[in-house]
Amino acid sequence: MPPGDGSVVGRYSERRSPRSDPTLETIELETRSGPRFSVIWLHGLGADAHDFEPIVPELVRAHWPALRFVFPNAPVRPITVNGGMRMRGWYDIGGADIASKQDEVGIRASIGAINTLIAREGERGIA
Protein backbone atom coordinates (compact mmCIF):
# COMPACT_ATOMS: atom_id res chain seq x y z
CA MET A 1 0.00 0.00 0.00
CA PRO A 2 1.22 3.51 -0.68
CA PRO A 3 2.19 5.80 2.19
CA GLY A 4 -0.64 7.85 3.62
CA ASP A 5 -3.29 5.20 2.94
CA GLY A 6 -5.77 6.98 5.18
CA SER A 7 -4.89 5.11 8.37
CA VAL A 8 -4.95 8.24 10.46
CA VAL A 9 -4.11 7.90 14.11
CA GLY A 10 -7.23 7.90 16.23
CA ARG A 11 -6.09 9.07 19.67
CA TYR A 12 -3.46 11.44 20.93
CA SER A 13 -2.33 11.94 24.49
CA GLU A 14 0.58 13.58 26.20
CA ARG A 15 1.69 12.22 29.56
CA ARG A 16 3.64 14.56 31.79
CA SER A 17 5.12 12.99 34.88
CA PRO A 18 5.71 14.75 38.19
CA ARG A 19 9.39 15.14 39.08
CA SER A 20 9.15 12.28 41.59
CA ASP A 21 7.85 9.88 38.90
CA PRO A 22 10.67 7.93 37.22
CA THR A 23 8.57 7.55 34.07
CA LEU A 24 9.59 9.77 31.19
CA GLU A 25 7.23 12.33 29.70
CA THR A 26 5.71 10.77 26.60
CA ILE A 27 3.60 11.51 23.57
CA GLU A 28 1.31 8.58 22.76
CA LEU A 29 -0.58 7.91 19.56
CA GLU A 30 -3.01 5.00 19.18
CA THR A 31 -4.19 3.87 15.78
CA ARG A 32 -7.42 2.48 17.26
CA SER A 33 -8.74 1.78 20.74
CA GLY A 34 -7.50 -1.29 22.59
CA PRO A 35 -3.98 -1.66 21.19
CA ARG A 36 -2.24 -4.98 21.84
CA PHE A 37 1.13 -3.87 20.49
CA SER A 38 3.35 -0.88 21.26
CA VAL A 39 6.24 0.78 19.50
CA ILE A 40 8.54 2.77 21.79
CA TRP A 41 10.47 5.18 19.56
CA LEU A 42 13.44 7.14 20.92
CA HIS A 43 14.47 10.48 19.42
CA GLY A 44 18.03 11.66 18.85
CA LEU A 45 20.17 14.27 20.59
CA GLY A 46 18.51 17.66 20.88
CA ALA A 47 15.23 16.44 19.37
CA ASP A 48 12.05 15.69 21.31
CA ALA A 49 9.07 13.36 21.41
CA HIS A 50 7.16 15.40 18.83
CA ASP A 51 9.74 14.89 16.07
CA PHE A 52 8.40 11.56 14.82
CA GLU A 53 4.66 12.15 15.34
CA PRO A 54 4.05 13.16 11.71
CA ILE A 55 5.48 9.90 10.37
CA VAL A 56 3.01 7.61 12.14
CA PRO A 57 0.16 8.01 9.61
CA GLU A 58 2.67 7.26 6.84
CA LEU A 59 3.76 4.01 8.52
CA VAL A 60 0.42 2.57 9.59
CA ARG A 61 -1.77 0.49 7.30
CA ALA A 62 -5.53 0.02 7.68
CA HIS A 63 -5.28 -3.77 7.95
CA TRP A 64 -2.75 -3.67 10.82
CA PRO A 65 -3.89 -4.38 14.37
CA ALA A 66 -4.36 -1.49 16.78
CA LEU A 67 -0.98 -0.04 17.79
CA ARG A 68 0.23 2.38 20.43
CA PHE A 69 3.23 4.53 19.50
CA VAL A 70 5.05 5.82 22.57
CA PHE A 71 7.48 8.68 22.01
CA PRO A 72 9.38 9.45 25.23
CA ASN A 73 11.22 12.70 25.86
CA ALA A 74 14.83 12.30 26.96
CA PRO A 75 15.75 14.37 30.01
CA VAL A 76 17.19 17.84 29.48
CA ARG A 77 20.86 17.76 30.49
CA PRO A 78 24.13 19.55 29.72
CA ILE A 79 25.83 17.96 26.71
CA THR A 80 29.60 18.34 26.96
CA VAL A 81 30.35 17.96 23.25
CA ASN A 82 27.97 20.88 22.59
CA GLY A 83 29.74 23.22 25.00
CA GLY A 84 27.60 22.17 27.96
CA MET A 85 24.41 23.42 26.31
CA ARG A 86 21.31 21.99 27.99
CA MET A 87 19.25 19.92 25.60
CA ARG A 88 17.38 16.66 25.45
CA GLY A 89 19.76 13.73 25.50
CA TRP A 90 19.64 10.14 26.69
CA TYR A 91 23.15 10.57 28.13
CA ASP A 92 26.02 13.06 28.03
CA ILE A 93 28.45 12.92 25.12
CA GLY A 94 31.94 13.89 26.21
CA GLY A 95 33.41 14.35 22.76
CA ALA A 96 33.42 13.19 19.15
CA ASP A 97 36.52 11.07 19.71
CA ILE A 98 35.76 7.35 19.98
CA ALA A 99 38.10 7.17 22.97
CA SER A 100 36.08 9.77 24.91
CA LYS A 101 34.88 8.57 28.29
CA GLN A 102 31.29 7.35 28.11
CA ASP A 103 28.57 8.62 30.45
CA GLU A 104 27.85 5.26 32.08
CA VAL A 105 25.65 6.80 34.77
CA GLY A 106 23.51 8.61 32.18
CA ILE A 107 23.31 5.54 29.95
CA ARG A 108 22.22 3.35 32.85
CA ALA A 109 19.63 5.94 33.95
CA SER A 110 18.15 5.99 30.44
CA ILE A 111 18.10 2.19 30.32
CA GLY A 112 16.19 2.20 33.61
CA ALA A 113 13.70 4.80 32.38
CA ILE A 114 13.05 2.88 29.15
CA ASN A 115 12.66 -0.37 31.10
CA THR A 116 10.06 1.43 33.24
CA LEU A 117 8.17 2.40 30.07
CA ILE A 118 8.31 -1.19 28.82
CA ALA A 119 6.96 -2.45 32.16
CA ARG A 120 4.19 0.15 32.04
CA GLU A 121 3.16 -1.07 28.61
CA GLY A 122 2.98 -4.60 30.02
CA GLU A 123 0.72 -3.35 32.82
CA ARG A 124 -1.50 -1.77 30.19
CA GLY A 125 -2.04 -5.13 28.45
CA ILE A 126 0.79 -5.13 25.93
CA ALA A 127 2.43 -8.55 25.86
Predicted features along the sequence, with ranges:
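Serine-hydrolase catalytic machinery in alpha/beta-hydrolase-like enzymes
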Residues: P2-P3, G10, E14-I126
